[in-house]
Amino acid sequence: MRGPKPTLQEIVLDLCPYNEIQPVDLVCHEQLGESEDEIDEPDHAVNHQHQLLARRDEPQRHTIQCSCCKCNNTLQLVVEASRDTLRQLQQLFMDSLGFVCPWCATANQ
């Protein structure tokens, strides 16, 4: 191309009819040999399910955002609990547990 704008004469298209479909080999011909490193033995195998269950029992920090039951101000709590304990706390929230902000707590005393 010469000049700032392409012209039709400068564009060269090399079009060939492609009527014949050529097959493509999609088979992988790779062969793997047996190796002692690749064989998982029960002593060296990692049990991921056991690790996940153990992690559930570990206490983790969770941020809970709720409203004051008196003035509806937003409260933010940080708790450290296991997954099961957090579920119990969630049930308490759904049932009858209410939180009071520090301002409403001191005003009512």
Curated annotation (Swiss-Prot):
Where in or outside the cell it occurs: the entry states:
Host cytoplasm; Host nucleus
Write down the InterPro entries for this protein, in alphabetical order: Papilloma_E7 (IPR000148)
Q: How is it modified after translation?
A: Highly phosphorylated.
Tell me one GO biological process term.
symbiont-mediated suppression of host innate immune response
Residue spans making up a coiled coil are none
The record's family statement is: Belongs to the papillomaviridae E7 protein family.
Report motif location: Nuclear export signal.
86-94
Chain spans, region E7 terminal domain: 1-41
**Organism of derivation:** Human papillomavirus 39
Keyword tags: Activator, DNA-binding, Early protein, G1/S host cell cycle checkpoint dysregulation by virus, Host cytoplasm, Host nucleus, Host-virus interaction, Inhibition of host innate immune response by virus, Inhibition of host interferon signaling pathway by virus, Interferon antiviral system evasion, Metal-binding, Modulation of host cell cycle by virus, Oncogene, Transcription, Transcription regulation, Viral immunoevasion, Zinc, Zinc-finger
The entry's free-text remark on domains says: The E7 terminal domain is an intrinsically disordered domain, whose flexibility and conformational transitions confer target adaptability to the oncoprotein. It allows adaptation to a variety of protein targets and exposes the PEST degradation sequence that regulates its turnover in the cell.
The terms describing its cellular component in GO are:
host cell cytoplasm; host cell nucleus
The residues forming the signal peptide are none
The gene it comes from is E7
The subunit field of the Swiss-Prot or TrEMBL record says: Homodimer. Homooligomer. Interacts with host RB1; this interaction induces dissociation of RB1-E2F1 complex thereby disrupting RB1 activity. Interacts with host EP300; this interaction represses EP300 transcriptional activity. Interacts with protein E2; this interaction inhibits E7 oncogenic activity. Interacts with host TMEM173/STING; this interaction impairs the ability of TMEM173/STING to sense cytosolic DNA and promote the production of type I interferon (IFN-alpha and IFN-beta).
Q: What does this protein do?
A: Plays a role in viral genome replication by driving entry of quiescent cells into the cell cycle. Stimulation of progression from G1 to S phase allows the virus to efficiently use the cellular DNA replicating machinery to achieve viral genome replication. E7 protein has both transforming and trans-activating activities. Induces the disassembly of the E2F1 transcription factor from RB1, with subsequent transcriptional activation of E2F1-regulated S-phase genes. Interferes with host histone deacetylation mediated by HDAC1 and HDAC2, leading to transcription activation.
| Domain of life, per lineage | Viruses
The protein's name in its UniProt record: Protein E7
Major place of localization? Answer: host cell
Q: What is the lineage of its organism?
A: Viruses, Monodnaviria, Shotokuvirae, Cossaviricota, Papovaviricetes
Alphabetically, the GO molecular function entries are: DNA binding; DNA-binding transcription factor activity; protein domain specific binding; zinc ion binding
- Zinc-finger (unnamed) residue ranges come to 68-104
Q: Where is this motif: LXCXE motif?
A: 26-30
